[in-house]
Amino acid sequence: MPSDSCLLSLTVLQRLRAICPPLSTFYLFFVIFVVSTIFHCHRRLGLVPAPWASPSLVVFPPRHMPREGMFTIRVKGRLGNQMGEYATLFALARMNGRLAFIPASMHSTLAPIFRISLPVLHSDTAKRIPWQNYHLNDWMEERYRHIPGHYVRFTGYPCSWTFYHHLRPEILKEFTLHDHVREEAQAFLRGLQVNGSQPSTFVGVHVRRGDYVRVMPKVWKGVVADRGYLEKALDRFRARYSSPVFVVTSDDMAWCRKSITASRGDVAFAGNGLQGSPAKDIALLMQCNHTVITLGTFGIWAAYLTGGDTVYLANFTQPNSPFHTVFKPEAAYLPEWVGIAADLGQPNTVGSGHASARAPKRHWGALL
C-alpha cells in the first residue's frame, strides 16, 4: 500500500499535468518565435551575397526613415565615374551632416575591387523615398555646403578633387584594394625587367581612346593623346628617374603597341586592352610609383590614388569648345600635377571623322 508521501507526490504531479501545457506546446511556441524573428530580420536587413560585402542592404520600414535625412546619388558611367560619384557623395554627406547610402548597382561595381564602407540602399526602399534630385557640377561650389532637403539624390558626373581632397586620407582608405586584387597586380610588376634588371621605379600609363577618338573632334572640338604627347611624357620620367619601367594600360592596346616605342626595353603593355577589365588595370596603375594619363576619369583616379608624380594631357580642346562649360581643368587636375599641351593641329582629328556633329545628351563624363 503506498505511503502518504507517495500519494501526495502523485497528487501534485496530477495537478501539474492539469495546469501545465504539454511539451509539444513549448516546441510549437519556440518554432513560432524563431520563424517570426527570421521574418522580421529579413524585412529589415538583406545581406549582399558576396564575400566582399560587409555593408548590408538597408531596408527602412516606412515609419522608420532617418529623421536627420539621407543623401544618395544616381549612378552613371563606368568605373571612373562611379568612383567620383562615390567620393563626392561621401564628402557632401559629411559636410552637410547627413547619412549617405549608395545604390546597389554602385556597390556591385566598386565593392569587388575596393574596401568601400558606405551602406547600400535597397532598391525597394529607394523607390518609396520622396527624393529631391539635386544636380552637381563637376567642381565644388559654396552652395553645396548647405544643401536643402532631407532626402536628396545627387545627379550629374561629379569627379573633382575639390569635393573631397580635404578628406584625402579617408578617400584613400575607401579605395583600398582588396588583398587578392593588389597581390595579383604586384605579382605582375615583380615579373618586369628593364634590360635584364629589376626596376625600382614603376610609371603607370593610361591611354584613353575608345569613343573619344570620334567624339572629341566632332562634338568637343578637341583631340585625344597622340604619339608625340606620350613620347614627351615618358621622356620626362626617363630624365628624372633611373631606369624606370612604363606599365601601359588602355582600351586600345593595338594602337598603343604601334604608337609607343618599346625598343628601349622599358615599356610593358599590360592587360588585354578591353573595357571589361577595369579592376586589373586600375590595380596595376595604383601599384606604380608615378602616372601618365591622357583623358578620362579612370586615369584621373589612378593618378590620385597612386600619388607620386603625374603628367596629364593639357589644352586638348579649342578655345571655343563647348567642353569648357562642363569641365574646369583646375578642378580636375591637382595643382602639383604637370600638364603637357596637346597638339591641336594633329591630322585627321579636329573637325574630321565620321561621327555626327550633334552634341550628345550625355555629359562628357559618361564617355570616360
From Swiss-Prot:
GO molecular function annotations of the record: fucosyltransferase activity; galactoside 2-alpha-L-fucosyltransferase activity
TM annotation in the entry: 21-41
Keywords: Glycoprotein, Glycosyltransferase, Golgi apparatus, Lipid metabolism, Membrane, Signal-anchor, Transferase, Transmembrane, Transmembrane helix
Compartments where located: Golgi apparatus, Golgi stack membrane
The keyword Glycoprotein is assigned to this record: yes
Annotated phenotype, changing H150Q: In strain: BFM/2Msf and C57BL/10SnJ
Catalytic activity: a ganglioside GM1 + GDP-beta-L-fucose = a ganglioside Fuc-GM1 + GDP + H(+)
GO CC, alphabetical: Golgi cisterna membrane
Topological domain ranges for the Lumenal compartment: 42-368
Membrane topology, from the record: Single-pass type II membrane protein
Domain of life of the source: Eukaryota
Class of enzymatic activity (EC top level): transferase
GO BP terms: lipid metabolic process; olfactory bulb development; oligosaccharide biosynthetic process; positive regulation of cell-matrix adhesion; positive regulation of endothelial cell migration; positive regulation of endothelial cell-matrix adhesion via fibronectin; positive regulation of sprouting angiogenesis; protein glycosylation
Functional pathway: Protein modification; protein glycosylation
Pfam families documented for this protein: Glyco_transf_11
CDD domains listed in its UniProt record: Fut1_Fut2_like (cd11301)
Effect on the protein upon substituting P62A: In strain: CAST/Ei
Cytoplasmic side: 1-20
InterPro entries: Glyco_trans_11
Carbohydrate attachment residues: N195, N289, N315
Effect ascribed to mutating A50G: In strain: BFM/2Msf, C57BL/10SnJ and pgn2
Miscellaneous comment in the UniProt entry for this protein: In mouse, there are three genes (Fut1, Fut2 and Sec1) which encode galactoside 2-L-fucosyltransferase.
Role noted for this protein: Catalyzes the transfer of alpha 1,2-linked fucose to ganglioside GM1 and galacto-N-biose.
Family indicated by similarity: Belongs to the glycosyltransferase 11 family.
Protein name (Swiss-Prot/TrEMBL): Galactoside 2-alpha-L-fucosyltransferase Sec1
Organism: Mus musculus (Mouse)
